[in-house]
Curated annotation (Swiss-Prot):
Name assigned to this protein: Large ribosomal subunit protein uL24
Species name: Staphylococcus epidermidis (strain ATCC 35984 / DSM 28319 / BCRC 17069 / CCUG 31568 / BM 3577 / RP62A)
UniProt gene name: rplX
Subunit structure: Part of the 50S ribosomal subunit.
Keywords, sorted A to Z: Ribonucleoprotein, Ribosomal protein, RNA-binding, rRNA-binding
A GO CC term assigned to this protein in UniProt: ribosome
Length: 105
């Protein structure tokens, strides 16, 4: 998967199209990512010993990785991800600017 935890992404399809956020979690086996403040759902929580009140909680749900695009670190625009070998290591690069994408977990 070309998107990692900590990346800044923009939603390019779906009900939250145009929103930007940071990737909180990735689910590589399902090809899904959880983005901060995007695809917020209301979840009904039963009362438990830890949370005696219960109630309705708002949480972010995962969206498909094809619906988000990485933001270029140089221009802050959506870009595709490429790979390049530097000093024997495979690094991610932004296709638009050629800038190396650092892993910022």
């Amino acid at each position: 998967m070309h998107i990692k935890k900590g990346d800044n992404v923009k939603v390019i399809a779906g009900k939250d199209k145009g929103k930007e956020g940071k990737v909180v979690a990735t689910e590589p086996k399902k090809d899904r990512v959880v983005v901060e403040g995007v695809n917020v759902i209301k979840k009904h929580q039963k009362p438990t010993q830890l949370n005696p009140e219960g109630g309705i909680l708002e949480t972010e749900a995962a969206i498909h990785v094809s619906n988000v695009q990485l933001l270029d670190p140089k221009t802050n625009e959506p870009t595709r991800v490429g790979y390049k070998t530097v000093d024997g290591k495979k690094v991610r690069i932004a296709k638009k600017s050629g800038e190396e994408i650092k892993a910022n977990n």
